[in-house]
From Swiss-Prot:
The lineage of its organism: Bacteria, Pseudomonadati, Pseudomonadota, Gammaproteobacteria, Oceanospirillales. This is Protein ApaG. GO terms for biological process: error-free translesion synthesis. InterPro entries: ApaG_domain, ApaG_sf, Uncharacterised_ApaG. It comes from the Bacteria. It comes from Chromohalobacter salexigens (strain ATCC BAA-138 / DSM 3043 / CIP 106854 / NCIMB 13768 / 1H11). Residues 2-127 form the ApaG domain.
Length: 127
């Protein structure tokens, strides 16, 4: 299975949402667009997600759920799946990292795809 994991790439593009944020109320909204590239010869299905969100206050939140944005997409060989979601933090800086549980539909085996840590930073914050 580790061989298949090496062929699944996850790219993240975070963005601060100033219009939805209220810093005076300690509400900082970030969107993140994720592209999952399947560079393997097998179709995969994204079954579940696990996020660890660390806020600037040190508070850690774990989020687990089925699929992403209400879907459990099937991603064929050479294809990609792109979606946008959001996170609301109590401070201007945070870090997200996690993993996807995917199914190799050829072998009918589940495997984990790690998502490297990425930074969420509001305006005038060090990136």
């Amino acid at each position: 299975m580790s061989e298949l994991v090496e062929h699944i790439q996850v790219h993240v593009e975070p963005e601060y949402q100033a219009g939805e944020s209220a810093p005076g109320d300690q509400r900082y909204v970030f969107s993140y667009t994720i592209t999952v590239h399947n560079r393997s010869a097998h179709s995969i299905q994204l079954l579940a997600r696990h996020w660890k969100i660390t806020q600037s206050s040190g508070k850690v939140q774990e989020v687990r759920g089925k699929g992403v944005i209400g879907q459990q997409p099937l991603i064929g060989p050479g294809q990609q799946f792109r979606y946008t979601s959001r996170a609301v933090l109590d401070g201007p800086v945070g870090v997200m990292e996690g993993s996807y549980t995917c199914l190799d539909t050829t072998e009918q085996r589940a495997f984990e795809v790690p998502i490297a840590a990425f930074r969420l930073a509001g305006p005038n914050q060090v990136h």
